[in-house]
């Protein structure tokens, strides 16, 4: 969310007409050497009176600090006192206090680029920079986390990044969130991380939910690593889907016809289409540079999205569930999401996954996507950072489900004991062992991964809305999507 700062005209005792555009802002504090300071997810800025722009003071991750629950004060000598929280899913927040002063850092720099780094990624970089004696990760973001960004600004940022890469200015480490992993992989820009894992004496694949690595893999190579994952899926009551192992779009359509237009929770036509575009790779062959958005299968998907679009215009909204909901789309971040729905369906809960033709279709949503540049001259150092994502200690601080089995067991046991940071989701505060087992089965059975390509998604949704509004038929919209998507894909090859 973006913010503006308004000041008070003390003569008129009214708001000043001039306002300062702050952009995404996580905190605002008065200063000594500056009139005030503000910070976003990555940088602290200082502002002089009347200035429209602040000057960067320091980067949080450079200092080894996260931006969760930050309190800040400036001393008269220019030093800063910072109190910052450190997260762990099994306990309440703990705090660290740091006194920051200017100094030299002689460690070797590892460059890292992100379009918009999540708080979890910033924390991972901060933790590494706080503890590693040899290397320091220097994180550059195009946009702070949660800043409002137009499609044009986003596309221009991707063009700028790709231009830098073409000119040889490739960072050592890439945050692949919001970038097309398939395109970067097909161009040979990303290291295969399987050999790094195999030669690391402290990492054993069997300690993890290995299906996560398999889902991420492309052509037998591992383009990035994550530390945690959520599961995108659909669920319903046992009586509604008895005998089904997964479902097709046609079967999901019957739910709407049988139980009413507003019977699927957390789903609109546009969101359904976006979810399927991110998870169903059958419409694009990146190796051949071809797509099939004019196929009967995609037209049917578009028609179903239109039916949901009509129903969602009069839906219940918010996150509260009504007795009218026969099914729901859910992103399972913790065991408490399972607990909540199990109670709603009186224990008769079935996870069928997203609609597809091959049985249960559960999708992994990685918490982070961190890859190593194939052209980096500091691959050893880059791996020093990337490997920290796999450590049990680090994964205890993830906000999603850890993919390390021991970390998973510890955070889910905390949920059973009522000591998880996620207790606010479920008012009773405790999950059951059955909830834990179902969560584990769900994570262990997910065989697909969510892939982002915001430019392509925006293009497709723009044309889909023409169908939703009645301006075009589903077939006409699909043909226009096919034409524009083909052009975009050819430009990327």
Language-model segments: which ranges?
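Short, well-ordered beta-strand elements
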Residues: 105-118, 135-142, 173
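Extracytoplasmic/periplasmic substrate-binding proteins
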Residues: 48, 303-384, 409, 413
């Amino acid at each position: 969310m973006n913010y503006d700062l308004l000041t008070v005209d003390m003569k008129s005792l009214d708001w000043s007409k001039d306002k300062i555009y702050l952009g995404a802002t996580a905190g605002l504090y008065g200063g000594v050497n500056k009139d005030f300071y503000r910070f976003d997810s990555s940088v602290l800025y200082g502002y002089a009176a009347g200035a429209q722009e602040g000057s960067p003071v320091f980067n949080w991750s450079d200092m080894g600090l996260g931006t969760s629950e930050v309190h800040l004060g400036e001393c008269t000598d220019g030093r800063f006192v910072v109190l910052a929280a450190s997260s762990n899913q099994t306990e309440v927040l703990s705090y660290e206090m740091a006194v920051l002063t200017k100094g030299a850092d002689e460690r070797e720099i590892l460059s890292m680029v992100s379009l918009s780094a999540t708080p979890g990624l910033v924390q991972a970089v901060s933790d590494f920079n706080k503890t590693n004696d040899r290397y320091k990760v220097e994180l550059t973001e195009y946009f702070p986390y949660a800043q409002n960004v137009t499609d044009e600004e986003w596309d221009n940022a991707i063009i700028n990044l790709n231009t830098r890469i073409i000119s040889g200015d490739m960072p050592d480490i890439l945050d692949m969130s919001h970038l097309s992993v398939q395109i970067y992989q097909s161009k040979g820009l990303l290291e295969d991380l399987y050999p790094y894992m195999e030669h690391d004496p402290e990492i054993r694949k069997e300690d993890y939910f290995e299906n996560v690595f398999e889902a991420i893999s492309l052509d037998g190579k591992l383009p990035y690593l994550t530390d945690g994952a959520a599961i995108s899926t659909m669920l319903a009551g046992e009586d509604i889907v008895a005998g089904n192992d997964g479902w097709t779009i046609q079967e999901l359509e019957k739910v709407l016809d049988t139980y009413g237009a507003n019977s699927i929770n957390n789903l609109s036509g546009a969101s359904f289409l976006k979810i399927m575009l991110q998870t169903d790779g059958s419409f694009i062959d990146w190796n051949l540079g071809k797509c099939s958005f004019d196929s009967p299968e995609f037209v049917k998907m578009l028609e179903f999205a239109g039916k949901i679009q009509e129903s969602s215009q009069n839906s219940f909204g918010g996150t509260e569930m009504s007795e009218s909901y026969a099914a729901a789309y859910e992103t399972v971040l913790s065991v408490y999401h399972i607990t909540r729905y199990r109670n709603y369906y009186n224990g008769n809960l079935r996870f069928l996954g997203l609609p597809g033709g091959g049985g249960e279709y559960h999708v992994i949503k990685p918490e982070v996507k961190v890859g190593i540049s194939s052209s980096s001259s500091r691959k050893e150092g880059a791996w020093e950072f990337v490997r920290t994502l796999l450590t049990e200690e680090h994964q205890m601080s993830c906000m999603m489900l850890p993919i390390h089995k021991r970390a998973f067991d510890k955070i889910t046991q905390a949920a059973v004991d009522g000591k998880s940071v996620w207790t606010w989701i479920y008012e009773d505060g405790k999950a059951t062992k059955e909830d834990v087992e179902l969560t584990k089965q769900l994570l262990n059975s997910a065989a697909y991964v969510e892939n982002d390509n915001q430019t392509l998604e925006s293009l497709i949704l723009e044309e889909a809305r023409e169908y939703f509004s009645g301006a075009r038929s589903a077939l006409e919209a699909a043909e226009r999507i096919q034409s524009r998507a083909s052009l975009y894909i050819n430009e990327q090859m």
